[in-house]
Amino acid sequence: MSFTIRRATHEDKSDWLRMRQGLWPDAPIEYLDFDLDDRLADPDYAVFVASNADGQLVAFIEAGLRDYGEGCETSPVGYIEAWYVNEHIRGQKLGKELVYVAEGWAREKGCEEMASDTWLENETSIAAHLKLGYQEAERLVHFVKRL
């Protein structure tokens, strides 16, 4: 199956939001929807979408610039903020291609390193990152206490 990867536009917002819901199913829609226009307009943020042969959007990656990334030695750092491939087409190397596009964007922005994160229990994501040459930098546990 062939896919086309391109920069997201405002016309992609509804499909992009649908895929964000697939990535973060427990997040309120208001949280997932509130910053889409800002992200598309931000020169230090890039959203790339992938469509199948029928033109349907089936995957996306969001990348941004950060001053710091855990384990990184340079600044700014390209950062994979979100990465999603429809579960029915995983394993076809589309996720890898999206990461390569995001890495290319970060290089164009002057970055020498790319970073990312995932939940500790997301073994699929951890394996995908490792397969693409990423190294685990650290593990982090967040704490909270109600006062």
Describe the role of every protein-language-model region.
Residues M1-E11:
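Conserved N-terminal entry element of GNAT/NAT acetyltransferase domains
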Residues V49, Q56-L65, Y79, Y84:
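Conserved beta-strand in the GNAT
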